């Protein structure tokens, strides 16, 4: 037997078994592209982020100016910043579609993979939040103030916890310095968790659109899915580069062009678009602690999804009632996202409350009930 380095070398064989000779279902659709797209997003964000960190100064008196300097005086600094800022949006688009795919096709029944995935989402949200504070514009400062303040709703230890988090009695220089440290560290935590996520995935192999075992018909990942992933890369990079070059501030808040001022509150404090659904749920409850719990529950509910699966079928491919419910949930999330961007006044308050109620009702009550009904109708 000739020495096949790819299959025998201690390091190369890990790469080989993950990216080249990996047995993959023959019928997975484009919805299975988002895992590799998320990997691409992560690599891109780490590279652009590293280049930005070389020119950034984490100090309240210099942060805003250092970002402006980067965009004006550093070679291609404007491009690196625009790719990094909009890359975050694409990261979230991909992760939301990836989660939606997992939900639709019952991929959450790979429980370890799913749970690590939810932890990855939480880490990504934390990273994006602390990153948004770094340019030290108005929305950075007030966003940080509002969101960190939520910890003060925790009974007994809340106030102490918030002051410990701030490193003082308000969001100030210590807060900015530690947020920069977190923003530098967390992407590497995400990279580590991604490897754990893949390790668990490769224990069971990928799910497929039919939700049935596919061991009888597997094909090697390379060249079939490596070339398919390259197409996905192109289809994501083209809109990203277009956005970064033609309309880089489309998704940002104009308030952030004003340096942070603790004495002037912006008229509408709101997070980046990818947090608006959770922000709408937070605002829909007229009680601080209740809102914080609902906010946490809006993401943590994902941990419960494998436990709420009562259908005898894995995927929703042949479950039309669950499909209707799924797309209703998608529409509901879009409504929440829109409401989160609107001021707190009639009719947005009641719309937000109804949409928040619908979100939890669909996931926790209607999905299990409808799944049980489908089992009965189909005599499963």
From Swiss-Prot:
Keywords: Electron transport, Heme, Iron, Membrane, Metal-binding, Mitochondrion, Mitochondrion inner membrane, Respiratory chain, Transmembrane, Transmembrane helix, Transport, Ubiquinone
Membrane-protein topology: Multi-pass membrane protein
GO MF, one example: ubiquinol-cytochrome-c reductase activity
Alphabetical GO biological process terms: mitochondrial electron transport, ubiquinol to cytochrome c
Needed co-factor(s): heme b
Transmembrane intervals: 34-54, 78-99, 114-134, 179-199, 227-247, 289-309, 321-341, 348-368
UniProt superkingdom: Eukaryota
CDD domains: cytochrome_b_C (cd00290), Cytochrome_b_N (cd00284)
Binding site for a ubiquinone: 202
Pfam families: Cytochrom_B_C (PF00032), Cytochrome_B (PF00033)
Cofactor: binding comment: Binds 2 heme b groups non-covalently.
Binding site for heme b b562: 84, 183
One GO CC term on file: mitochondrial inner membrane
Residues annotated to bind heme b b566: 98, 197
Location of this chain's protein in the cell: Mitochondrion inner membrane
Further information: Heme 1 (or BL or b562) is low-potential and absorbs at about 562 nm, and heme 2 (or BH or b566) is high-potential and absorbs at about 566 nm.
Quaternary context: The cytochrome bc1 complex contains 11 subunits: 3 respiratory subunits (MT-CYB, CYC1 and UQCRFS1), 2 core proteins (UQCRC1 and UQCRC2) and 6 low-molecular weight proteins (UQCRH/QCR6, UQCRB/QCR7, UQCRQ/QCR8, UQCR10/QCR9, UQCR11/QCR10 and a cleavage product of UQCRFS1). This cytochrome bc1 complex then forms a dimer.
Family statement: Belongs to the cytochrome b family.
PANTHER family: CYTOCHROME B
Functional description taken from the UniProt entry: Component of the ubiquinol-cytochrome c reductase complex (complex III or cytochrome b-c1 complex) that is part of the mitochondrial respiratory chain. The b-c1 complex mediates electron transfer from ubiquinol to cytochrome c. Contributes to the generation of a proton gradient across the mitochondrial membrane that is then used for ATP synthesis.
Protein name: Cytochrome b
Organism expressing this protein natively: Corvus frugilegus (Rook)
Recorded name of the encoding gene: MT-CYB
């Amino acid at each position: 037997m000739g020495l096949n380095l790819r299959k025998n070398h201690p390091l190369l064989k890990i790469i080989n078994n993950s990216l080249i000779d990996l047995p993959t279902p023959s019928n997975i659709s484009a919805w299975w592209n988002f895992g590799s797209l998320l990997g691409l997003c992560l690599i891109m964000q780490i590279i652009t982020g590293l280049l930005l960190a070389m020119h950034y100064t984490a100090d309240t008196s210099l942060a805003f100016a250092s970002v402006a300097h980067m965009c004006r005086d550093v070679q291609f600094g404007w491009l690196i910043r625009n790719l990094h800022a909009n890359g975050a949006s694409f990261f979230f688009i991909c992760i939301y579609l990836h989660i939606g795919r997992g939900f639709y096709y019952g991929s959450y029944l790979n429980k370890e993979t799913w749970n690590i995935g939810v932890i990855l989402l939480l880490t990504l949200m934390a990273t994006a939040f602390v990153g948004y504070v770094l340019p030290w514009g108005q929305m950075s400062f007030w966003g940080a103030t509002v969101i960190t303040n939520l910890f003060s709703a925790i009974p007994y230890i809340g106030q102490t916890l918030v002051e410990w988090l701030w490193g003082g009695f308000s969001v100030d220089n210590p807060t900015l310095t530690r947020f920069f440290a977190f923003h530098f560290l967390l992407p590497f935590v995400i990279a580590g968790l991604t490897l754990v996520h893949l390790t668990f995935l490769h224990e069971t192999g990928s799910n497929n659109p039919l939700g049935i075992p596919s061991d009888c018909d597997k094909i090697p990942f390379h060249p079939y899915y490596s070339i398919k992933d390259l197409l996905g890369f192109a289809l994501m990079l083209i809109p990203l580069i277009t956005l970064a070059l033609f309309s880089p501030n489309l998704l940002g808040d104009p308030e952030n062009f004003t340096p942070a001022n603790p004495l002037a509150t912006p008229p509408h404090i709101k997070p980046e678009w990818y947090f608006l659904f959770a922000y709408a749920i937070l605002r829909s409850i007229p009680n601080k602690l209740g809102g914080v719990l609902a906010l946490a529950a809006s993401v943590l509910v994902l941990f419960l999804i494998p436990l709420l699966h009562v259908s005898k079928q894995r995927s929703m491919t042949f479950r039309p009632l669950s499909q209707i419910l799924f797309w209703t949930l998608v529409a509901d999330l879009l409504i929440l996202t829109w409401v989160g961007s609107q001021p707190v006044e009639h009719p947005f308050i009641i719309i937000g409350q109804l949409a928040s109620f619908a979100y939890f009702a669909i996931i926790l009550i209607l999905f299990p009930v409808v799944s049980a009904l489908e089992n009965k109708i189909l005599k499963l």
